[in-house]
Amino acid sequence: MLPVEVPLSQLGPPVLLLQLLLPPTSAFFPNIWSLLAAPGSITHQDLTEEAALNVTLELFLEQPPPGRPHLHLEDYRGRTLLADDIFAAYFGSGFSSRRFRAALGEVSRANAAQDFLPASKSNPDLHFDAERLVQGRTRLEGALRETLVAARALEYTLARQRLGAALHALQDFYSHSNWVELGERQPHPHLLWPRRELWSLAQVGDPTCSDCEGLSCPGNMMNLTMLTSGYFGTNPPKPPGKCSHGGRFDQSSSQPPRGGINKDSTSPSFSPHHRLHLQAAEVALLASIEALSLLRSRLGTRGFSRLLDITPASSLSFVLDTTGSMGEEINAAKIQARRIVEQRQGSPMEPVSYILVPFHDPGFGPVFTTSDPDSFWQKLTEIHALGGGDEPEMCLSALELALLHTPPLSDIFVFTDASPKDAFLTNRVESLTRERRCRVTFLVTEDPSRAQGRGRREALSPSRFEPYEAIALASGGEVIFTKDQHIRDVAAVVGESMAGLVTLPLEPPIFTPGEPCVFAVDSLLSKVTVRMHGDISGFWIKSPAGLSQGPEEGIGPLGHTRRFGQFWTVTMTDPPQTGSWEIQVAAEGTPRVRVQAQTSLDFLFHFGISAEDGPHPGLYPLTQPVAGLQTQLLVEVTGLVSRQKLGDGQPQFSHAVLRRVSEGTHLGRVSLEPVGPPERGLLAASLPPTLLSVSVPFSLELVGQDVGGQCLRRSAPQPCSVAPVLLELSGPPDFLTPGSKAPLSLRVASFSGPQDVDLRSSVNPSFSLTSNLSRARLGLNESAWGCLWLEVPDSAAPDTVVTVTVTVTAVGQGASQVPPTHAFLQLLVLAQSSKDQLEDPTHSAAPVLPPTTPALLPSTLVTRGRAGRGTTGKTWWGTVGGVLFLLGCTSW
């Protein structure tokens, strides 16, 4: 552990935990994947996660769990904090830290992205570079204010993005300035107080550094008592006598005075003041804890817990058709919602938030979001079936609205008896479900093969529900067809799906009537349930011991069978026998079979590409791989045993299996290599080039063994897809204001061959949005750039979240086989003067989060040039930036 040089008696309660943290081999490079370049360094990701764990443990210590033993600080002294450990101690062993770790991943990736995004990586204000310390503090306070406003509006994805940006700037202050060189070992007492001066800032004519010829520059600073920071690159140019940032990526470090002062890593090749790296990291960690504690004081414990998803529970999100024929369905939704509220209120599984979006042709919405179950119930009771009833309805528009306001890793339930009128949104909604990692289940009280139905103007096609099928497949959900008399019973899947279940992979993955399918049950699974629906005439389930159970309702030798029309569930008796189970179904057509279970062992994942040409080396996160671009699969296993039990062994995943979704054919098997300490559960693998050569959806399954040697299999809830092009969308570093005009930068690049593409953009709400790039012809490894201008009307309401969507569609021969690519960007509208501004520190105990003035980016012309070095030799870097599917916001 790193020593703390400040007496513990001088620190506040959050800082008392510091001795427990910061493993010496874990800030300053972007993420842990940077450590290949500088082993032993502490990264932005480390600092962010450790600070969040500190504040979370403090929260757990102050808020004892109802009906459970209190946590004691002494139990964690001398140990590295692990999310799985403290969650198990607080909530119990059956509750997963997966959502919390996913939220931390969102913040950490948003933090790291500041070093990669075109709009932020070279902006000195966002990194406290070039002696722009006052401007840097203004941007820092603005990002914290955005975090606060977005969290209060229940827009947690946006709040985590802005929190990551704020923490990056805060941590950079201690690595890029000379605060540590001045002998300071505590955070700057005025940095989060905007009405207090930073004091003793070096002026334009003050020399700050002397020349340093070598890589390591321990004595290159002048005898200063003034605060300064280094210049990076050529914008702005370094004045005579000033310090450089330093390191191999800094062009200014070769100009006198040579060298630099950054403490980003332990490597002199990157950090001339590498010897002060650990000291800078200690202070940056203290400052990060201080900032998170500030947010907790402003949001309250409940609001802060939702910001970081310090809960095993998910959100409850309904999309309701309110046309005249939907009376039974609406009542079923109300019954399930009431049951969930009553059963879970006050428990760890109480929903984090409640979302409701009605639709009724020709309209949809508005969206209703709340964290108060009573308010949600009141709103739900006001929903009634209205007049009308013509097929089809604006279902996908309502679903898109729900996706934009539902937290990641949530289930969304759509109740309807109509096909979609807005089927043209199918691809965009599919992409949004993957980006938000939300699972969509459609409960449809309409037989797709039935020609009759509710009122309609023309004959209905049996394929009219295919958009629902496509979205359910892309999101990992399902479409359940039922009838009015069964909807209340079938709707019980709402409560069951919200229990944090995992879906077990079937072998073969594509079900064939009359042929058995196999699924593996390991020792970490409980409450195994088989769900089947379709035109089923019979089924048989066989255990590893050879016991069988058929379609007879009631309790059988293996579990409890229930039937509601053509919807069947079989809940296995706990504990289920470990080993290989078989299912065989007799049905007309293709039955739908899903096996789910409860477990604490699961995984999160995202993709990444190596970044070598930015300010720092690292692995840049993507939500999906890009065709032709060398990509890493990055896995984070959740629910591993604590360090105290490692001697007894732990489950291990050895490889990942990739399959084509439509046919289930084998696409490849890749070995998973551990990264860092085993208790962190981090794994990585290189995706095979054959997978990245075409844009096809594929499933991801991890395979390994549990502690007893039984086969261990976990599958990603959603299929993955390979994007045909890399699409970047990035905005200004600040918030929007009413009456402003903000430029957004756009880039599209191809790595799989020449492509002609069309680009379309839209914005919600309907503000004015113009673009100077509507079509591009791309060669191999070429990019096209453009600019969008977003005009915010004077009448725009403060605290409004604006979502910009860009869609790239291939044109020309074979274009119909190439799926569209979408990018989503969320921005926040704030008033210049806000109610969130607090009083001066002399009248308040908390730091102030004041308004800031956004600085607009210069106009970007449409140009074309080389995207990078290609996909062979050195790993490509050059066009990645901005937002790819709301880039790096979530991990499943």
Swiss-Prot record:
Glycosylated residues (UniProt): 54
Signal sequence annotation: 1-27
GO cellular component terms listed in the entry, alphabetical order: extracellular region
Keyword annotations: Glycoprotein, Secreted, Signal
Region (Disordered): 231-272
Cross-referenced Pfam families: GBD_Hemicentin, Ig_VWA7, VWA7_4, VWA7_N, VWA_4
Keyword NAD appears in the UniProt entry: no
Domain of life (superkingdom): Eukaryota
This protein's name: von Willebrand factor A domain-containing protein 7
Species: Rattus norvegicus (Rat)
Lineage of the species this protein comes from: Eukaryota, Metazoa, Chordata, Craniata, Vertebrata
